[in-house]
């Protein structure tokens, strides 16, 4: 199952890099691309649906965290000319994270601060 998931993800990366146009800077990436953007920076606010301090992952719909302060504001954009996928991450120490769309890698910034809710699975297990 894990191998199949990795193959599908690799295929989607290939499609993203070669067939999709530039993505202007946005805080709301297209729904069809959420799984891509949320895989590499899973703490982005657009990856979570938060109500009353409980946040549910939009991709898996089964991972919960209980601290809204763990969620960071993100803007993403894609430059097809340079084959770059970029994140602007706003937290206590705002930064930029860029990667080659064809060779993505996870951001390892503040996910260690995310807290699970009700014995749920941590964010690290969802990657």
UniProtKB/Swiss-Prot annotation:
UniProt xrefs under Pfam families: v110
Source organism, top-level taxon: Viruses
Protein name in UniProt: Protein MGF 110-14L
Family recorded in the similarity comment: Belongs to the asfivirus MGF 110 family.
UniProt keyword list: Signal
Coiled coil spans: none
Role: Plays a role in virus cell tropism, and may be required for efficient virus replication in macrophages.
Signal peptide stretch: 1-17
């Amino acid at each position: 199952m894990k191998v199949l998931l990795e193959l599908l993800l690799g295929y989607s990366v290939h499609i993203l890099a070669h067939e999709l146009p530039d993505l202007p800077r946005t805080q709301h990436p297209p729904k069809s691309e959420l799984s891509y953007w949320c895989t590499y920076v899973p703490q982005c606010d657009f990856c979570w649906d938060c109500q009353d301090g409980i946040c549910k992952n939009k991709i898996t719909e089964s991972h919960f965290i209980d601290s809204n302060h763990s969620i960071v504001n993100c803007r993403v954009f894609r430059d097809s000319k340079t084959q770059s996928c970029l994140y602007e991450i706003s937290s206590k120490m705002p930064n930029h994270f860029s990667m080659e769309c064809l060779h993505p890698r996870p951001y390892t910034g503040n996910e260690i601060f995310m807290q699970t809710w009700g014995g749920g699975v941590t964010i690290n297990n969802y990657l």
